[in-house]
């Protein structure tokens, strides 16, 4: 590379000056250029301190010469063997050394050095395990051996709790499917699996004291599907081997329909309800030791129905019983406030803050069932867990939650219809590395062109794409590089709540328009696969207006005539609350607000919906093709050369989400990828 670029000193100086001027012009002068090794061997989550060396370490075999952590070294040996790399006395030397590291959260910290040999330092098995997880991410096969980048890492987590939650009370998932996801969690250094075991549709953990909890009469979804006590202990052991703690949740007194039906209680005020629950929490705590399962979650949120109300002291007695088993107690915030409670851990949701003096876990604004695969990843990347750079004695960390409340037809649909795996990868960086600031401006949109923040996102996104291709083959990963896409948008034009009103944009694309005496101009380029004009949770977006009509345009270059697959959508249907703010569109509509899409002046027809015109309260009717990323892609004819894409996105008072997605995709064997030979540009 140097011999090609730098023929002599003069050219080198000119090149250097020009390059730096270019970076200054683009607003990236304060960012280091990525080392080529970093591009080839990206690590997620990003280590706290990392220096890439000069070149790579090639090896045929390995030789673990010393290890103070036998379980971890055995696991590393098994990993290499699975990769086809055996141990031998003349292999590359690997040492795993026990040593106290002078960093925050030293129990999970590690150092990793790769040069002519490999050294790992950690003070605990956890630290050694995370070092090995990092090492596993950067091994590349070459012939009969392997390659590793030369580097030095010192790493530790910003937060002590880095978790993920599944709601199996509403929708059961098999042990195998849970284990698949837990394995991925461990790869990205999560250390908590929050297991929501009970909800209105079912009580999913076997009780030998009250077997009627698993009866078909008590269960409204997935009848006969529950976890035996042996299943439960198996998952706990599987997690423990990966240094993940299970937090089981029995959510009471709300979300208790299955419990009440099973026990024959009309309301939670039935005098038998509390003794029964005390028995159930005793039974739960008896399954696993306090050392291996130190937290118990009792819910207490959303007590909104008369039959869920309880007397004062009800929840306090459950708290006392759980604490008597030497467990830390977790409750949702917002939830029932218990007089005298000063020690419960508050798990935050929506926009709630912790109670003063309480330890807390942050689950605000990161419910995966609401997340679009593109815009949602910006939120997970830029949000600051606990709204502070790192954890402390009160700010314990965060838990990413999946709440697909609606009934699902097949357990795999939970992974197909929610961006589970992309969310795990993006959030892992924020919860391990930490964030210096909470960048609320980018919770619903990507930063503007030529900003440091966009460049930071692009760098991380490139890492995600490498991980997607290396580590998620055969798994649902609905994400492509969205920083490739730039849009000009114009509006909102006043539509007086008439979504069918047409504006001059539909007649000709020109730089500006005058409508009813008001001038409209196309915006500077907006970046992203999904654009929110106004976000449904009120996060900063492109407008503060509640109604109107926007248009968006870009050009796509194709090297040939082709029928190209696109992901197209105008409403991200949250996978909860039925068809929230429905009804679902009828045939011939993209959405009830009548958005339009034209390519080269040809209108693109919406899908032939499998379940058109369903009403809002349709929680029990599973989704099939409601969202763009799990239905068949829209096929659009592209001509050779530049193709003009134009979208119309109206909004009225009856709709909730004002947004669109329109990106070309390459899908093969259910794996989505970028279309590598297409190019994109804005017009204005």
Sequence positions of predicted segments:
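A short beta-strand element within beta-rich, extracytoplasmic domains
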Residues: 560-589
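Beta-strand-rich ligand-recognition modules
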Residues: 579-581, 587-662
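Flexible, acidic glycine-rich loops studded with aromatic residues
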Residues: 350-482
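Short beta-strands within extracellular/lumenal beta-sheet-rich domains
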Residues: 544-557, 630-634
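Active-site neighborhood of glycoside hydrolase catalytic domains
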Residues: 259-345, 350-354
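Accessory carbohydrate-binding/adhesion or oligomerization-edge regions at the termini
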Residues: 20, 35, 39, 458-548, ...
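Acidic, contiguous N-terminal accessory segments
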Residues: 20, 28-154, 331-336, 342-344, ...
């Amino acid at each position: 590379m140097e011999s090609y670029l730098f023929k002599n000193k003069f050219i080198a100086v000119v090149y250097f000056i020009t390059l730096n001027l270019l970076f200054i012009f683009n607003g990236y002068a304060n960012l280091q250029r990525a080392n080529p090794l970093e591009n080839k061997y990206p690590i997620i989550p990003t280590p706290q301190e990392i220096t890439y060396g000069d070149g790579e370490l090639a090896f045929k075999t390995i030789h673990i010469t010393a290890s103070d952590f036998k379980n971890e070294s055995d696991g590393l040996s098994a990993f290499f063997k699975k990769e086809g790399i055996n141990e031998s006395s003349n292999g590359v030397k690997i040492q795993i050394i026990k040593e106290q590291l002078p960093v925050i959260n030293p129990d999970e910290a590690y150092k990793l050095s790769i040069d002519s040999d490999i050294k790992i330092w950690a003070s605990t098995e956890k630290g050694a395990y995370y070092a090995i997880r990092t090492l596993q991410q950067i091994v590349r096969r070459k012939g009969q051996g392997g390659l590793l980048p030369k580097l030095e890492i010192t790493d530790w987590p910003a937060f002590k709790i880095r978790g993920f939650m599944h709601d199996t009370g509403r929708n059961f998932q098999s042990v195998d499917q849970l284990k698949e996801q837990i394995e991925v969690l461990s790869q990205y250094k999560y250390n908590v699996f929050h297991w929501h075991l009970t909800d209105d549709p079912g009580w999913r953990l076997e009780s030998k004291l009250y077997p009627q909890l698993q009866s078909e009469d008590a269960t409204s979804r997935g009848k006969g599907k529950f976890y035996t006590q042996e299943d439960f202990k198996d998952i706990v052991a599987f997690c423990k081997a990966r240094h993940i703690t299970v937090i089981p949740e029995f959510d009471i007194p709300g979300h208790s329909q299955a419990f009440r039906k099973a026990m024959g209680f009309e309301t939670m005020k039935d005098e038998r309800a509390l003794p029964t629950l005390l028995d159930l929490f005793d039974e739960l705590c008896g399954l696993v030791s306090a050392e291996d399962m130190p937290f118990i979650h009792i819910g207490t949120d959303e007590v909104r129905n008369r039959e869920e109300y309880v007397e004062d002291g009800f929840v306090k007695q459950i708290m006392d019983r759980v604490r008597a088993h030497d467990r830390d107690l977790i409750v949702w915030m917002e939830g029932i406030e218990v007089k005298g409670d000063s020690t419960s851990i508050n798990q935050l949701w929506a926009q709630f803050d912790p109670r003063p003096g309480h330890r807390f876990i942050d689950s605000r604004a990161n419910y995966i069932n609401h997340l679009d695969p593109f815009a949602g990843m910006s939120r997970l990347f830029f949000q600051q867990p606990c709204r502070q750079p790192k954890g402390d004695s009160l700010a314990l960390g965060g838990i990413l939650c999946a709440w697909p409340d609606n009934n699902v037809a097949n357990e795999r649909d939970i992974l197909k219809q929610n961006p589970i795996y992309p969310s795990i990868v993006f959030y892992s960086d924020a919860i391990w590395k930490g964030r210096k600031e909470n960048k609320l401006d980018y919770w619903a949109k990507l930063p503007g062109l030529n900003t440091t923040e966009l460049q930071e996102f692009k760098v991380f996104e490139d890492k995600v794409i490498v991980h997607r291709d290396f580590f998620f083959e055969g798994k649902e990963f609905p994400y492509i590089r969205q920083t490739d896409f730039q849009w000009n948008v114009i509006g909102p034009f006043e539509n007086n709540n008439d979504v069918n009103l047409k504006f001059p944009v539909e007649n000709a694309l020109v730089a500006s328009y005058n409508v009813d005496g008001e001038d409209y101009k196309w915006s500077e380029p907006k970046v992203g696969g999904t654009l929110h004009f106004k976000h449904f949770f009120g996060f900063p977006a492109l407008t503060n207006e509640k109604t109107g009509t926007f248009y968006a345009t870009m050009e796509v270059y194709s090297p040939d005539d082709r029928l190209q697959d696109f992901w197209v959508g105008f409403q991200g249907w949250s996978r909860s609350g039925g068809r929230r703010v429905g009804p679902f569109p009828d045939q011939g509509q993209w959405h009830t607000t009548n958005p339009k899409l034209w390519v080269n002046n040809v209108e693109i027809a919406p899908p032939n919906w499998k379940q058109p015109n369903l009403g809002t309260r349709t929680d029990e009717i599973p989704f099939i093709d409601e969202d763009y990323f799990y239905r068949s892609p829209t096929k659009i004819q592209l001509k050779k050369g530049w193709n003009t894409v134009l979208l119309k996105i109206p909004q009225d008072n009856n709709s909730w989400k004002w947004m669109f997605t329109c990106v070309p995709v390459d899908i093969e064997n259910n794996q989505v990828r970028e279309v590598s030979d297409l190019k994109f540009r804005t017009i204005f």
